[in-house]
Amino acid sequence: MSYRELVVELAREHAEALSDALLDLGALSVSVEDADADTPDEQPLFGEPGLVPDRTAWQHSRVVALLSADHEPAVLLAAAANEIGLAETPKFVVREVEEQDWVRLTQSQFEPIPIGERIWVVPSWHDAPDPDALVLELDPGLAFGTGSHPTTRLCMEWLEQSVKPGQSVLDYGCGSGILAILAKKCGANPVIGIDIDPQAVESARQNSERNRAEVTYGLPDACPDGEFDIVVANILSNPLKLMASMLASKVKPGGRIALSGVLARQADEVAAVYARYVDISVWREHEGWVCLAGTRRESH
């Protein structure tokens, strides 16, 4: 059986309503994406620490609906547009989607990933290429972080070089838990992972259990008081700037901090905010992204 994708670009205020209408009218699934993704106009959605995002779509949104072959896309879209009160039916594109073995296709797209000197990120359906390496078993899922993105890779390379056995580590914005798990496998103790998304926290817990890595996870209000030898945050530049004072305060005097999720063109601006608290600079750049790393100044 073949399927079709109906792709519509429209303003944020109509995206959620159109999505609901398409589902009501028989769409098999609907997703909302940033129509400006991977461009300078990309708009990440995020909440303040401890809060969920207050927006569910982007200013310039792309609605993608999966339809069975017996649905006529133009008719369905016209009905959905009428249902939500749009004066005109939005422009759209239709893409053919052939029936496939989706599990096998998904698995074929995720091969073991070598990172740094001795790290392998390995999906559960693969054997580790080097059993003696530092192996993290991680499947792609709902939470961000499989090692394939440059920012995750940069943070992992930094942790591999920086963590010493017995050091305490805070992973703020832990996503899948990949950085916290790596820190634990490098000998860190204790390791804490914090995320604003309860689904990410649960995913991280499951990944830690699979990797036999003892990490404590929680939402921001569960973040323990006190300071850590190492703080790592792979988020995005805007929330990193907003949380600079809080994140810096979690680093012990003389301790280290690593920040990623920062484009190379944003590095100076982020570094300037953190320079009030830590001596910080670009540690490494990869594919247009950077990892900033620094040391908290000793108290006098």
From Swiss-Prot:
Residues that, per the record, bind S-adenosyl-L-methionine: T152, G173, D195, N234
Q: Principal localization? A: cytoplasm
Q: Does the keyword Cytoplasm apply?
A: yes
Localization per record: Cytoplasm
Q: Name one Pfam family in it.
A: PrmA
Sorted keywords for this record are:
Cytoplasm, Methyltransferase, S-adenosyl-L-methionine, Transferase
Choose any GO biological process term that the UniProt entry carries and state it: methylation
The reaction(s) annotated as catalysed by this protein in its Swiss-Prot or TrEMBL entry are: L-lysyl-[protein] + 3 S-adenosyl-L-methionine = N(6),N(6),N(6)-trimethyl-L-lysyl-[protein] + 3 S-adenosyl-L-homocysteine + 3 H(+)
A GO MF annotation of the entry reads:
protein-lysine N-methyltransferase activity
Q: What class of enzyme is it?
A: transferase
What InterPro entries does the entry give?
A: Ribosomal_L11_MeTrfase_PrmA (IPR050078), Ribosomal_PrmA_MeTrfase (IPR004498), SAM-dependent_MTases_sf (IPR029063)
Q: Does the keyword Hydrolase apply?
A: no
Q: What is its EC number?
A: 2.1.1.-
Gene Ontology CC annotations of this record: cytosol
- Please give the family membership noted in the entry: Belongs to the methyltransferase superfamily. PrmA family.
Per its database record, what is this protein's job? Answer: Methylates ribosomal protein L11.
Record-given protein name: Ribosomal protein L11 methyltransferase
Q: Which organism is it from?
A: Burkholderia cenocepacia (strain HI2424)
Give the taxonomic lineage as stored in the record. Answer: Bacteria, Pseudomonadati, Pseudomonadota, Betaproteobacteria, Burkholderiales
